[in-house]
Structure formats: structure tokens, C-alpha cells
């Protein structure tokens, strides 16, 4: 007797649009490519110590409403121009959410917020939003969680993150080694730094692995390695944004021969999951910068139009501009923090 041994737990199968088809639907424009190219160049210069500007990744924890995302971008644009001498501002545009157990996995996976999982529509929404925002002159930063989705959107992404749960993943290190943008690796959820140090080292080297082409075919990819990778301190069992922890992380990076420039995530475990504490964390980091710390090259903030968060109980009754994942600070608080960071950079220059 021949037993069935494959697909025993697969309940459905639906074809997804090939990446090159989505690229034809939403082709990158000259203006968008200029935004991405110049932002990547600016971030490279910050990472290599050629620029003393501060990289700031700021925006909603996740995008669930593209209209609100576009409104946020419109608020951010004039501030980007005003603070451009001190800050390189990149809008946080996260479409994929890692879950500790289960939950909404992001706009690409479930754009309608109703477990219909219309991924084709989610991919279209994601690329359309990235294209519009890049056309406005605003660079985007995103987390790379799924290993296939970068083929759909990575040409429109100026900075990428690998999250705490995936930093140790070989597949994500290989992906980062071939991405065209700078990439930040978060420390482990328990606060351990070694996994991020190892990830930076691994991603800087060439790799050969299997993946999918833009035509949707399996292929063997060879990468050159990504020298624009850095650590993101996001806290662990305790916060790790303070000067002592920054010094420890810098020393560990230096000992392993890695770039000592690092970013501090003001949210997550550093804020102890209290969005209002981002203000305190960011103020502390600004103080370190003001005091002359040149190893802090970036800051990450979770910010939205409206403070706090909400559950998706009835999607027709959602508060416009408020997060449905992690709680965020409001726009007015964000604006004040960005100005504080810019002043800290000015003070560091004068020190």
C-alpha cells in the first residue's frame, strides 16, 4: 500500500501574484528611485561615520489603514525638511507583524482585518503606499519577516529591520546579505547581544541559498554580503538604552570587529511596553547624544496620529489613526521628540 505522505496539513492553496507582475502594475518612478537611492546613501554615510546626522525611524507600529499612513506622511514631510541638517528621518512602514502566539499578522497577510487573508490585495496595498510615499520624497523603513515578500517591495525600501525573534534565523541573515538597503538587527528578546553581533557578521559575508525570482521561479541566489548592517538595542528582560548598556554593546561590537554604530529602539522592552515611556527613553538617549556619544547613530520611535492602541472588535468602529498592534505616542509628542533629538545633534557637534 502506498501511503499519502505529503500536504497532510494543507487545507487550501491559492496562487499569489508574481513579483514582476506587481512591479508592472506599480512601477517605480524616477522620483521614487531618487528618494530611495539618496536615503540609502545618507544612511550608509551615517553608518560609516562620514555623516554626524542621526537616523530616525519613526511611524506607526504597523500600517492597517493606508489613508492614515498617507496622512502621517504628510505631517512628517515638512518636519523632515526643517530638521534635515541634523536628522535623517525615515518613516516606519511595517506591513508584517511577528506574533508571540497568534494574532493579526499585518496588512500584507490580512488587509481587510477579517481573517480573509487576501494576500494579493495586501501586496498591492503595500506597494502602492510605498510608491506614493517615496514619490513624496519620504524614505520608508520596514521589517523583513517573510522571506518572499521582499521581492515585491524591497526596491522601494530605504532601510530594513530584522526583528528580535528572527535575528538568529539563518534565512534572515542570508536575506540581509543580499538586500540593497542598510539593515538593523535587534538584540534577542531576552536582551542578549551576541545573536545580533553574530547576525551582523554573518550578513556582511557572501551567501548562496535558494529563493524565488521576480518571475516566481525557484533559483539559486548568490549575494555579495551587506556591509551596512548594524545593531538595534530594543531591551530584553530589562531596558538597555542607558549609557552603561550602550557602552557594553559598543564594546561587544568592537571586540568582534563589527561597526560600533548602533540604533536604540525607544519602544518594546526599552519602554517596558508602556508607550508613554518612549518619551523618557528618547530624552535619555538625546542626553547621551548631547554629551558627545558618537556611537548612537539612530533612534526608533513608534508613533501614530492618535496615542495608544485599540483592539479590532468591529473594524467599522475603529478609531482613525490609532494603532491596532503596539501602543504609539501621538503626533504632537513625536514632533517635540524629533526637535529634541535635532537639538542634541547640534550640541554634539559643538561639544
Predicted regions and their residues:
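Active-site-facing alpha/beta catalytic cores
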Residues: 2-7, 73, 86-241, 245-246, ...
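N- or domain-start disorder-to-order transition segments that initiate the globular core
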Residues: 8-47
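Gly-rich Lys/Arg/Thr-decorated short loops/hinges at beta-loop-alpha junctions or inter-strand turns
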Residues: 19-27, 223-235, 318
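Acidic (Asp/Glu)-rich catalytic clusters
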Residues: 47-50, 80-84, 130-137, 222-223, ...
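Conserved phosphate/anionic-ligand binding catalytic regions in large, soluble enzymes, centered on
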Residues: 55-68, 326
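Conserved, mostly hydrophobic/aromatic
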Residues: 59, 264, 330
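Internal helix-turn-beta structural module
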Residues: 304-347
Amino acid at each position: 500500500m502506498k501511503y499519502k505522505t505529503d500536504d497532510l496539513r494543507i487545507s487550501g492553496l491559492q496562487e499569489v501574484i508574481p513579483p514582476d507582475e506587481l512591479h508592472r502594475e506599480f512601477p517605480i518612478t524616477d522620483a521614487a528611485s531618487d528618494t530611495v537611492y539618496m536615503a540609502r546613501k545618507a544612511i550608509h554615510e551615517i553608518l560609516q561615520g562620514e555623516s554626524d546626522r542621526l537616523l530616525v525611524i519613526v511611524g506607526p507600529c504597523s500600517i492597517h489603514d493606508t489613508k492614515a499612513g498617507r496622512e502621517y506622511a504628510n505631517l512628517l514631510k515638512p518636519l523632515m525638511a526643517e530638521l534635515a541638517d541634523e536628522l535623517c528621518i525615515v518613516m516606519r512602514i511595517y506591513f508584517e507583524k511577528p506574533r508571540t502566539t497568534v494574532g493579526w499578522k499585518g496588512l500584507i497577510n490580512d488587509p481587510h482585518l477579517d481573517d480573509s487573508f487576501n494576500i494579493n490585495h495586501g501586496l498591492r496595498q503595500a506597494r502602492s503606499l510605498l510608491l506614493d510615499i517615496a514619490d513624496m520624497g519620504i524614505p520608508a523603513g520596514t521589517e523583513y519577516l517573510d522571506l518572499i515578500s521582499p521581492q515585491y517591495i524591497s526596491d522601494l525600501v530605504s532601510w530594513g529591520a530584522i526583528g528580535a525573534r528572527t535575528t538568529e534565523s539563518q534565512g534572515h541573515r542570508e536575506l540581509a546579505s543580499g538586500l540593497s538597503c542598510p539593515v538593523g538587527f535587534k538584540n534577542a528578546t531576552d536582551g542578549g547581544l551576541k545573536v545580533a553581533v553574530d547576525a551582523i557578521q554573518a550578513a556582511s559575508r557572501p551567501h548562496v541559498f535558494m529563493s524565488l525570482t521576480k518571475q516566481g521561479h525557484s533559483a539559486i541566489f548568490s549575494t555579495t554580503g551587506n556591509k551596512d548592517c548594524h545593531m538595534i538595542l530594543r531591551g530584553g528582560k530589562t531596558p538597555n538604552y542607558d549609557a552603561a548598556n550602550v557602552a557594553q554593546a559598543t564594546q561587544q561590537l568592537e571586540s568582534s570587529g563589527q561597526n560600533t554604530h548602533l540604533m536604540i529602539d525607544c519602544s518594546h522592552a526599552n519602554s517596558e511596553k508602556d508607550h508613554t515611556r518612549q518619551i523618557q527613553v528618547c530624552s535619555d538617549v538625546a542626553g547621551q547624544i548631547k554629551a558627545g556619544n558618537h556611537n548612537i547613530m539612530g533612534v526608533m520611535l513608534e508613533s501614530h496620529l492618535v496615542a495608544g492602541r485599540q483592539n479590532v472588535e468591529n473594524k467599522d468602529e475603529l478609531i482613525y489613526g490609532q494603532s491596532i498592534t503596539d501602543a504609539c505616542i501621538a503626533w504632537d509628542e513625536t514632533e517635540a521628540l524629533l526637535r529634541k533629538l535635532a537639538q542634541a545633534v547640534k550640541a554634539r557637534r559643538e561639544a
